[in-house]
From Swiss-Prot:
Summary of the function given for this chain in its UniProt record: One of the components of the core complex of photosystem II (PSII). It binds chlorophyll and helps catalyze the primary light-induced photochemical processes of PSII. PSII is a light-driven water:plastoquinone oxidoreductase, using light energy to abstract electrons from H(2)O, generating O(2) and a proton gradient subsequently used for ATP formation.
Presence of the UniProt keyword Isomerase in the record: no
Protein name in the entry: Photosystem II CP47 reaction center protein
Protein source organism: Chlamydomonas reinhardtii (Chlamydomonas smithii)
Gene3D superfamilies: Photosystem II CP47 reaction center protein (3.10.680.10)
Assembly and binders: PSII is composed of 1 copy each of membrane proteins PsbA, PsbB, PsbC, PsbD, PsbE, PsbF, PsbH, PsbI, PsbJ, PsbK, PsbL, PsbM, PsbT, PsbX, PsbY, PsbZ, Psb30/Ycf12, at least 3 peripheral proteins of the oxygen-evolving complex and a large number of cofactors. It forms dimeric complexes.
SUPFAM superfamilies: Photosystem II antenna protein-like (SSF161077)
GO molecular function, one term: chlorophyll binding
TM region positions: 21-36, 101-115, 140-156, 203-218, 237-252, 457-472
Protein topology in the membrane: Multi-pass membrane protein
Length: 508
């Protein structure tokens, strides 16, 4: 039988044994990829500086997902927090990767077995002797088992009853660690940034899945519903499965891009909206003002700002700054962050403090403008000499650093002031090592951006796949030329002239 590549799946339509086989092989491929990718990432990951060179700056994709579920130690002797691993045990990064590869091998062998021994008695209808699958019952079994798994994850793993818990952090991504989480059963459980909602929703959804599974195992669908939804067709199962997958892909794309308790910024990097809204900038200013109110000097106040918080307030960590087709990790763009130079404070010759207007997300270049506290432009870096009345030279702008490596230093040289004004457009100023990775200076996206882009694309593709296969299975008889009124046309006595719908209809 010569089939084109896009029709080869038809060979498993009436072959339950080999249908199981191809699903086992698919799961083997997914599991094998996950384990292999994890081992690759472990081999290239540098755990030495979790503050300025975290996993998301290095382009790690699998490691953040392992970490948020409670894996923090490596057999290599390191931990995700930069400390020395004491007792990693079997559930280390390498242990989980190995488990996935072993599972992949077992699934591969199971797939080969089911492909070879496809004609099992189990798959034959005892009444007809033909191959058949009780799809409503199989649906109930899947619901029941997935409900048990969902409940177990929420009730045991997340809560720490039997498991490590999950990654929990503060809104500013400073205190993250793996810890047990108590379920939130009130309205706060619907807060997407509340980790307690993860536990309670998995418990509730798991109970619902178990009950729904038992219902479908015990109750048979009516004949009208069975045929109306084509419950006997494997293509119906394909269509509804694709619907579940594309919906899940859309949801996780949203929680990843907009941020949630399940996508902490310490593991996946900040969101673009945290830059757009000045989220970290406001927190830094709040902390500085609080220190000043306690009597600290400007230098001391800025020195108290965690380097981690300052690094978040840098546009290069914005996932929307990297183009979709710029391959590579963030470190391949602006380089490996070495240290915070400190907060740059600009002043004109009249003593007014000036603030550099920050670059919006979707700009590659932006005019360098220095505004006073009232928002009035007092200085800039002009494009032409004819427009230079606000130039750094004429206004006499100086820059002083507080905190960081340049703490207490003041620069008045116009060329140096311009250099730091351009850097201040991008947020807090950091020194980068661009030679180690031969970084090209062009921003890249973080795993948050790649995950979102990939899942939105696949969700759209699967959405059309759902429509396609759903239409094929529901309107199969119509596509085959069998219309709804075909029985009326061929039934004797319905029309005065058999098969002629234009003739008068007999009254009954």
């Amino acid at each position: 039988m010569g089939l084109p590549w896009y029709r080869v799946h038809t060979v498993v339509i009436n072959d339950p044994g080999r249908l199981i086989s191809v699903h086992l092989m698919h799961t083997a491929l997914v599991s094998g990829w996950a384990g292999s990718m994890a081992l690759f990432e472990i081999s290239v990951f540098d755990p030495s500086d979790p503050v300025l060179n975290p996993m998301w700056r290095q382009g790690m994709f699998v490691l953040p997902f392992m970490t948020r579920l409670g894996i923090t130690q490596s057999w290599g002797g390191w931990t995700i927090s930069g400390e020395t691993a004491t007792n990693p045990g079997i559930w280390s990064y390498e242990g989980v990767a190995a488990a996935h590869i072993i599972l992949s091998g077992a699934l591969f062998l199971a797939s080969v077995w089911h492909w070879t021994y496809w004609d099992l008695e189990l798959f034959r209808d005892p009444r007809t002797g033909k191959t058949a699958l009780d799809l409503p019952k199989i649906f109930g079994i899947h619901l029941f088992l997935s409900g048990l798994l969902c409940f177990g994850f929420g009730a045991f793993h997340v809560t720490g009853v039997f498991g490590p818990g999950i990654w929990v952090s503060d809104p500013y991504g400073l205190t993250g660690r793996v810890q047990p989480v108590a379920p939130s059963w009130g309205a706060d459980g619907f807060d997407p940034y509340n980790p307690g909602g993860i536990a309670s929703h998995h418990i509730a959804a798991g109970i619902l899945g178990v009950l729904a599974g038992l219902f479908h195992l015990c109750v048979r669908p009516s004949i009208r519903l069975y045929f109306g939804l084509s419950m006997g067709s494997i293509e119906t199962v394909l269509s509804s499965s694709i619907a579940a997958v594309f919906w899940a892909a859309f949801v996780v794309a949203g929680t990843m891009w907009y941020g949630s308790a399940a996508t902490p910024i310490e593991l996946f990097g900040p969101t673009r909206y945290q830059w757009d809204q000045g989220f970290f900038q406001q927190e830094i200013q709040k902390r500085v003002q609080a220190s000043l109110a306690e009597g600290a000097s400007l230098s001391d106040a800025w020195s108290r700002i965690p380097e981690k918080l300052a690094f978040y307030d840098y546009i290069g960590n914005n996932p929307a700054k990297g183009g979709l087709f710029r391959t590579g990790a963030m470190n391949s763009g602006d380089g490996i962050a070495v240290g915070w130079l400190g907060h740059a404070s600009f002043k004109d010759q009249e003593g007014r403090e000036l603030f550099v207007r920050r670059m919006p997300t979707f700009f590659e270049t932006f005019p360098v403008l220095l505004l006073d506290k009232d928002g009035i432009v007092r200085a800039d870096v002009p494009f032409r000499k004819a427009e230079s009345k606000y130039s750094i030279e004429q206004v006499g702008v100086s820059v002083t650093f507080y905190g960081g490596e340049l703490d207490g230093l003041t620069f008045t040289d116009p060329a140096t002031v311009k250099k730091y004004a351009r850097k201040a457009q991008l947020g807090e100023i950091f020194e980068f090592d661009r030679s180690t990775l031969q970084s090209d200076g062009v921003f890249r996206s973080s795993p948050r951006g790649w995950f979102t882009f990939g899942h939105v694309c696949f969700a759209l593709l699967f959405f059309f796949g759902h429509i396609w296969h759903g239409a094929r299975t529901i309107f199969r008889d119509v596509f085959a030329g069998i219309d709804d009124d075909i029985n009326d046309q061929v039934e004797f006595g319905k029309y005065k002239k058999l098969g002629d719908t234009s003739s008068l209809r007999e009254a009954f």
